[in-house]
Amino acid sequence: MLEVGSKKFFEAYAKISLIDIYNSELKNAELLECPDIQDCTNSIGVEVTAIPNKQRFMAAKIAKKCFNKELDLDDINAIVSEDFKSFNGVIFEWEGRKYISSSKGYEDFSDKIDSIAEIILKKVDKFNNNYKRFNENDLYIFCHNANFTVNDITIIIGRIDLNVFPYNKVFFNCIDKIYLFDLKQVNQINISLEKLEKYKQCAINYSDI
């Protein structure tokens, strides 16, 4: 089993979600290095990364400590108030399942937009130095926030020189939606809560490593 929030968890989650929303043939891809997801049969490589987020790591710890232990929301909130005082996210229940988000309400995205743009530029440098090349080279970014809009993604893309950009596609994972930039336009793909739970559980139990 993979620990939620670990590097391999993110890689497995990215692969599982891409199989569902983009290319089912990626089921044969392997989790390797440089890039993280490699499908040699179809010549597709996907590098996976995530923006740093202390609240996200705290949410993962809360989920590990409190979820799947027959605790109701009041019990969980009491534990959070006692042991995770700086947590600023939200915990909720829907159709008998409990969910946790590391953020809530309106946020100033300027810092987050800067962070994502910087990460993309760093990945471009690394790609040009020592990454294996495929016919299709993609980048998958966990943004850890459901409030990003198409406009936010467009702003991020505007900070990139596409004339020397090595990736064919960029997937921006924004929790309940994934934005796909194909060098021409940004498409929004909505992900249901049921699928979010499925992706998570499949990633936790991913064993083809």
Segments (PLM) and residue ranges:
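Conserved catalytic cores of phosphodiester-cleaving nucleases, focusing on short active-site segments
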Residues: 37, 44-50
